[in-house]
């Protein structure tokens, strides 16, 4: 098909993922500007791309990777600059709503610099690769409300580790 050029609602679109209804969810990094992070959602159709919601500000820094639970109810972005993860509800129409007013749904620790994330097939666990301290933070996902409960941190990864997959 013909490529479509669509300006982003937020500045510096970085991570992206499609939910089960075909909505495009995008992290807006704002050039890594302090406490400017956000996410936006878009409707994608043969006629083009249109904004559903956003930018929905999370007051965190440098949102990076985006993951969505299998049921399509929750989405998360890793905030590299502030060492945490922000969670959002995805409403049926694709509208995003931030879980926590402060945007901190799960902390990966000071200096952790979370980058890549993955959710296992049952959407029970979220794994976050932390580039600042070469660890993986593991969280249990609350399947009713989307909250994140820290389970463990795995250390000893090689410096420069990138990419993450979960089953």
Residue positions per predicted region:
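Beta-rich, blade/repeat-based domains predominating
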Residues: 8-24, 36, 57-73, 105-125, ...
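Residue position within the beta-strands of beta-propeller blades
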Residues: 25-27, 77, 128
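Short loop/turn segments immediately following the C-termini of beta-strands
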Residues: 29-31, 44, 80, 90, ...
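Structural motif
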Residues: 34-40, 84-87, 135-138
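Short loop/turn segments immediately following beta-strands, especially the blade-tip
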Residues: 41-49, 87-97, 139-147
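C-terminal hydrophobic structural anchor segments
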Residues: 86, 94-133, 138
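Blade-level signature of beta-propeller repeat domains, shared across WD40, Kelch, NHL, RCC1
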Residues: 131-167
């Amino acid at each position: 098909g013909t490529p479509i050029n669509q300006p982003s609602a937020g500045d510096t679109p970085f991570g992206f993922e499609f939910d089960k209804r075909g909505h495009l969810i995008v992290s807006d990094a704002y050039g890594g500007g302090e406490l400017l992070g956000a996410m936006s959602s878009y409707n994608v159709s043969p006629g083009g791309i249109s904004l559903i919601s956003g930018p929905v500000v999370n007051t965190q820094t440098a949102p990076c990777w985006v993951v969505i639970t299998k049921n399509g109810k929750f989405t998360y972005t890793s905030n590299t600059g502030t060492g945490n993860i922000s969670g959002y509800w995805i409403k049926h129409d694709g509208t995003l709503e931030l879980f926590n007013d402060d945007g901190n749904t799960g902390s990966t620790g000071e200096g952790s610099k979370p980058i890549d994330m993955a959710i296992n097939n049952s959407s029970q666990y979220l794994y976050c690769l932390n580039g600042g301290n070469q660890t993986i933070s593991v969280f249990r996902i609350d399947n009713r409300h989307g909250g994140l409960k820290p389970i463990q941190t795995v250390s000893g990864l090689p410096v420069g580790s990138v990419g993450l997959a979960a089953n």
